[in-house]
Regions:
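Bacterial N-terminal signal peptides that target proteins for export
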Residues: 1-12
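Bacterial N-terminal signal peptides
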Residues: 10-20
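Eukaryotic helix-grip
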Residues: 25-215
């Protein structure tokens, strides 16, 4: 049975910031097939790219859920994240979060997100974890030394596969808020997204969450 809750958190978007600087066709383009499938497409009228990444992580859905719910700790394991905190709860049962990214070559970026947990994996390991987020860039004033991201939305979906593994779908769209060198865009499409999924996997496996026995 799905545990239905509404809570907020902030995902990593560094890969999207690096990837969004290069235009292309408006159909999905597969840029990687291993270790994860990664697809990209430009969003019309913006500098943003839609990113779709999915694949198997060697951690239980409960472990991954625990890692992704703890937005305040993203700075400890997510690539490029230098600051992450929960700002305040929201009236709908969610929360507002703040994240600052320290990126190579380009200026630091930050974003404020209103993120909701739509469903959770139960203690027995059944169900699906789903989290969605959307930027609220004007929730409080921007910092003078950091570029504020205004378009940032996406979702996580985690389904248990058994034997301590999970299938993860990570979708997001981010406007980079400025020019991004081509080599960084290419890295963002592949390496940074892969690094994010691997970071989540590593963090999840390190957490003391019991993995339900296989049925």
């Amino acid at each position: 049975m799905l545990g239905m809750t509404r809570r907020w958190g902030a995902p990593l978007v560094a890969g999207a910031v690096l990837a969004a600087g290069v235009a292309g066709a408006q159909e999905w383009e597969t840029v990687a097939t291993s270790p994860y499938v990664i697809k990209v497409r430009p969003r019309p009228g913006t500098k943003a790219k839609d990113i779709w990444a999915e694949g198997e992580l060697k951690a239980s859905a409960l472990q991954i859920q625990t890692a992704l719910e703890d937005q305040g700790s993203y700075r400890l394991f997510m690539p490029y994240v230098k600051e992450s905190r929960v700002v305040r709860p929201t009236d709908d049962g969610g929360r507002l979060t703040y994240t600052r990214l320290d990126l190579p070559v380009v200026s630091s970026r930050d974003y404020i997100c209103h993120v909701v947990t739509e469903s959770k994996v139960a203690a027995d390991g059944t169900g699906v974890y789903q989290q969605r987020w959307k930027a609220e860039p004007d929730a409080f004033p921007a910092r003078r030394d950091v570029v504020r991201l205004r378009l940032n939305e996406g979702s996580w979906k985690v389904e248990p596969k058994g034997e301590g593994t999970s299938w993860v779908v990570y979708k997001f769209t981010v406007d980079p808020a400025g020019s991004v060198p081509g080599f960084l865009a290419n890295m963002g499409q592949k390496d940074a997204v892969v690094d994010t999924l691997r970071a989540v996997e590593k963090r999840a496996k390190s957490l003391g969450v019991d993995t339900p026995p296989s049925k």
